[in-house]
């Protein structure tokens, strides 16, 4: 699924003046990508996702989607709020009602998606009320992924998760993307997520698009600008930049900027 935004604009009513809208945003989102969206609170990140999904109606500009709006899945900031007080099976399979599948087909889909999100199929008839916060997020994610979206939008879905919980969530997303050849956009305030999981990154400020590039170029060219926006660089990138300031021949990194890759480059340089 490809999405094209041209001069997109949206402004909130005056009584919601604590929210920043979107102003003249143009960008292309290609298929089969992992894209991070970053920016300080109120920069327009969530508004952008809601406009793409159709939860907000654009006021100016164009949104062109190569597909159906129903093929876009959406995970809110606190995914556990997306589930019902019912059994896990009923919650996950709720959206399948409109597809008119038979019981066997529904069960097959539910069991497959449970395996993907790491939940035991023996828990199908357990109540969602008795689940932990992490389990509720998995159920919410399963309920969206079972509809087989072409594109998944995640509005700070990792908020409140510890490092282990975050890694588990991204593993699910990466496995889903690889198996289904799909795309996902995720909002994050943690720049480590950008270096570890994103193929592209969108930087927003005050409702405007500042950069749309790959993580390697972003950290190489715009580190100072990111810090001026209050975005804390990943520790490995910060260390790398400080090291480069002391070297006569600065090290350049292109492509993979995951922490282990950067440390390997530094280690080879020091030898």
Swiss-Prot record:
Keywords: ATP-binding, Cell inner membrane, Cell membrane, Membrane, Nucleotide-binding, Translocase, Transport
Record GO cellular component, one term: ATP-binding cassette (ABC) transporter complex
Key word Thylakoid present: no
Residues holding ATP: 39-46
PROSITE patterns: ABC_TRANSPORTER_1 (PS00211), ABC_TRANSPORTER_2 (PS50893), CBIO (PS51246)
A Pfam family assignment: ABC_tran
Source domain of life: Bacteria
Subcellular compartments: Cell inner membrane
UniProt xrefs under CDD domains: ABC_cobalt_CbiO_domain1
Keyword Glycosyltransferase: no
Record's subunit section: Forms a stable energy-coupling factor (ECF) transporter complex composed of 2 membrane-embedded substrate-binding proteins (S component), 2 ATP-binding proteins (A component) and 2 transmembrane proteins (T component).
Protein name (database record): Energy-coupling factor transporter ATP-binding protein EcfA2
Organism: Fusobacterium nucleatum subsp. nucleatum (strain ATCC 25586 / DSM 15643 / BCRC 10681 / CIP 101130 / JCM 8532 / KCTC 2640 / LMG 13131 / VPI 4355)
Lineage of source species: Bacteria, Fusobacteriati, Fusobacteriota, Fusobacteriia, Fusobacteriales
Gene name linked to the record: ecfA2
């Amino acid at each position: 699924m490809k999405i094209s935004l041209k001069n997109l604009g949206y402004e909130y009513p005056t009584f919601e003046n604590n929210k920043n809208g979107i102003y003249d945003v143009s960008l292309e989102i290609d298929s089969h990508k992992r894209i991070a969206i970053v920016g300080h609170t109120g920069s327009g990140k969530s508004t952008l996702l809601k406009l793409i999904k159709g939860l907000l109606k654009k006021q100016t500009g164009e949104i062109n989607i190569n597909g159906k709006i129903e093929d876009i899945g959406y995970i809110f900031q606190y995914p556990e709020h997306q589930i019902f007080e019912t059994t896990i099976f009923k919650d996950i399979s709720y959206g399948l009602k409109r597809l008119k599948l038979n019981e066997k087909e529904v069960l097959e889909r539910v069991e497959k998606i449970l395996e993907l999100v790491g939940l035991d199929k023996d828990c199908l008839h357990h109540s969602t009320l008795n689940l932990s916060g992490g389990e509720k997020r998995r159920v919410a994610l399963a309920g969206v992924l079972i509809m087989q979206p072409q594109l998944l939008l995640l509005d700070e879905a990792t908020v409140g998760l510890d490092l282990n919980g975050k890694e588990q969530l991204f593993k699910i997303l990466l496995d889903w993307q690889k198996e289904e050849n799909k795309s996902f956009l995720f909002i994050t305030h943690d720049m480590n997520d950008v270096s570890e999981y994103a193929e592209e990154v969108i930087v927003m400020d005050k409702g405007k698009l500042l950069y749309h590039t790959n993580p390697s170029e972003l950290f190489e060219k715009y580190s100072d600008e990111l810090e001026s926006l209050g975005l804390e660089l990943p520790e490995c990138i910060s260390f790398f930049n400080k090291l480069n300031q002391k070297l006569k021949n600065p090290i350049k990194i292109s492509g993979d900027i995951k922490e282990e890759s950067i440390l390997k480059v530094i280690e080879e340089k020091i030898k």
